[in-house]
Amino acid sequence: MAGHSKWANTKHRKAAQDAKRGKIFTKIIRELVTAAKLGGGDPDANPRLRAAVDKALSNNMTRDTLNRAIARGVGGDDDGNMETIIYEGYGPGGTAVMVECLSDNRNRTVSEVRHAFTKCGGNLGTDGSVAYLFTKKGVISYAPGLDEDAVMDAALEAGADDVVTYDDGAIDVYTPWETFGQVKDALDAAGLVAESAEVSMIPSTQADMDADTAPKLLRLIDMLEDCDDVQEVYHNGEISDEVAATLE
């Protein structure tokens, strides 16, 4: 399957993401602890933990830090009895947005999430309002420059659902989330080095963003990601190469 240019859509946010690296690490550690507590410390037997481990490594977290977080979870440190909460809503331009949180205080979390939606021209919805538009999948991403046929052959042989090649040469491999770890291991063994690997919520439809709505959507994402309790933000906003170029 072919797609638009991917790197133009993401590179303009890289500097902001790098500036948030400390906060990103805190959130990943929280997920590692919770995943290990709920499903055990073996990533091969715990898909949620495996996804957290791969995300940690994609963000250049050291093995020592990663292993300490897993040990905390196995040892019963739950960081204040955290629970996973999913919020759903609509963002600028009618975008569907899902917000995955880890929280020990629902009232605090929903207040912060609702504030971000309201501030950016969106609104927080009810359970199920947009979830039907998303499917949970593993996503293994490769930067431009790899042999597309080699990635596709290795991915499909390993049990991937789909391989998307973009106009700029970037490649995304989609897997069932339950077998994400096994597919990633097979691709690693084939010598294919991923740019990133994570379990995500993939939208079934896209909402096209224009020069007016795109910056508003990015502001909403940034505000949500600034919330300590927010782990992930998923949306179906699509930013064209032309619009992305105006945001850099």
UniProtKB/Swiss-Prot annotation:
Localisation: Cytoplasm
An example Gene Ontology biological process: regulation of DNA-templated transcription
SUPFAM superfamilies: YebC-like
InterPro entries, alphabetized: Integrase-like_N (IPR017856), TACO1_YebC-like_2nd/3rd_dom (IPR048300), TACO1_YebC_N (IPR049083), Transcrip_reg_TACO1-like (IPR002876), Transcrip_reg_TACO1-like_dom3 (IPR026564), YebC-like (IPR029072)
Family annotation (Pfam families): TACO1_YebC_N (PF20772), Transcrip_reg (PF01709)
Main location: cytoplasm
An example Gene Ontology CC term for this record: cytosol
Keyword Transcription regulation annotated: yes
Source taxon at top rank: Bacteria
One Gene Ontology term of the molecular function aspect: DNA binding
Chain coiled-coil ranges: none
Family according to the record: Belongs to the TACO1 family.
Name recorded for this polypeptide: Probable transcriptional regulatory protein NT01EI_1596
Species: Edwardsiella ictaluri (strain 93-146)
